[in-house]
UniProtKB/Swiss-Prot annotation:
Keyword DNA damage in annotation: yes
Reported function: Involved in DNA repair and RecF pathway recombination.
GO cellular component, one term: bacterial nucleoid
Source lineage: Bacteria, Pseudomonadati, Pseudomonadota, Gammaproteobacteria, Lysobacterales
Protein name, entry field: DNA repair protein RecO
Any one GO biological process: DNA recombination
Gene this chain is encoded by: recO
């Protein structure tokens, strides 16, 4: 299959054999693709190598044969966000999530748009934690494993003042005992879950609970094997708060 002048975001790049690269991209029309960029070493290929960087928005042409395609041409369409600190780690995170959870060639039209929006939020450092929660929700919904965030597993409307455990398969479950501090730590309020359902940033400090709740759900769908970016973010935060 010939793919011509398709736009995409570069997710990941790694060496492939001696002089080539394996480039993972996210497209609107074809989903996630793995493309082999051959012979990219040397001065004449500097422009191409510069375009094949994570977060870069590109236009490319390729020949798709089987699992991996052959990249024929690529050019940068803008300047990729220059990130540092937590925003840089957040970009690693969203890219790793896509690589681990979204299979190649799966239709992800809405997720492509969500990625574009999240990329711009990273550029402006706009409500970083909230932006990541929205993107996580978009991934779950795209994969068909999302859940109703307006009602609990029994169909009862969420109580904004109550706390809920996010079950990966059934959705919110009301926390029945406030005495289990360990379980309570990994819960989110009905208020913040309803805000997530309506994609309206909440006026609350409960985003940490939402982060832990969503991580538990994602870990289930990751088969119990965590992300390298989670480890990097934890190490960064520890270093950042150390004297």
């Amino acid at each position: 299959m010939l793919i011509e002048h398709e736009v995409a975001f570069v997710l990941h790049v790694r060496p492939w054999r001696e002089t080539s690269l394996l480039v993972e991209v996210l497209t609107q029309a074809y989903g996630r693709l793995g493309l082999i960029a051959r012979g990219v070493q040397g001065l004449k290929k500097q422009t191409l190598r510069a375009a094949l960087q994570p977060l870069q928005w590109i236009r490319f042409s390729a020949i798709q044969r089987g699992e991996l395609g052959q990249l024929r041409q690529a050019e940068a369409l803008d300047t990729a966000p220059r990130l540092k600190g937590e925003t840089m780690l957040a970009s690693f995170y969203i890219n790793e999530l896509l690589l681990r959870l979204v299979p190649r060639h799966a239709p992800v039209n809405e997720l492509y748009l969500a990625y574009s929006q999240t990329r711009e939020r990273l550029r402006t450092n706009d409500s970083l934690a909230w932006s990541l929660r929205l993107f996580e929700l978009d991934i779950l919904e795209t994969l068909g494993v999302g859940f109703n965030l307006e009602c609990d597993a029994n169909g009862t409307p969420l109580d904004p003042a109550a706390r809920y455990v996010l079950d990966p398969l059934e959705g919110p479950r009301l926390l029945l005992s406030e005495h289990n501090n360990a379980e309570r730590r990994d819960t989110a309020t009905g208020h913040v879950l309803l805000a997530l359902a309506h994609k309206q940033i909440p006026n609350t400090n409960d985003l940490a609970g939402l982060r832990r709740s969503m991580r538990a759900v994602l870990l289930h769908h990751l088969g119990g094997r965590g992300l390298k970016s989670w480890e990097m973010i934890a190490a960064f935060r520890h270093q950042d708060t150390s004297p």
